[in-house]
Regions:
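Short, cationic-aromatic polyanion-contact patches
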Residues: 5, 24, 56-79
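Pre-recognition alpha-helix immediately N-terminal to the DNA-recognition helix
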Residues: 7-14
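Short helix-capping/hinge SLiMs at alpha-helix to coil transitions
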Residues: 14-20
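A short alpha-helical element within helix-turn-helix/winged-helix DNA-binding domains
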Residues: 22-31
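The short coil/loop that forms the "turn" connecting the two helices of the helix-turn-helix
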Residues: 34-35
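Helix-turn-helix DNA-binding helix
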Residues: 39-40
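Short, hydrophobic-biased segments on the C-terminal half of alpha helices
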Residues: 44-45
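A short, conserved structural fragment
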Residues: 48-58
Length: 85
């Protein structure tokens, strides 16, 4: 995992923790900052290939961290997500 991907994972985890849903690609571009939504999507696909996140392409706000993703980010999952695992 690259430093940019680690930061992306941490930002997604913090966003989920604070709001209870995932950020959009445009929000990730603003929060990190990244140069484009395609850069965000590429890095999310890499995190998915590492087994750290899941999402449904083409569907808004379906990005979720896996148990391994939460552990890697060093952040406890929100209570509602922990009870679903």
């Amino acid at each position: 995992m690259t430093p940019k991907q680690r930061r992306l994972l941490e930002v997604v985890a913090c966003y989920w923790q604070g709001r209870g849903y995932s950020p959009s690609l445009r929000e990730l571009v603003r929060l990190l900052p990244l140069s484009s939504t395609s850069v965000a999507a590429y890095n999310l696909r890499r995190l998915r290939s590492l087994g750290l996140v899941t999402f449904r392409p083409g569907t808004a706000r379906t990005l979720c961290l896996t148990a391994a993703g939460w552990a890697e980010a060093g952040i406890a999952p929100p209570l509602a997500m922990a009870s679903q695992a």
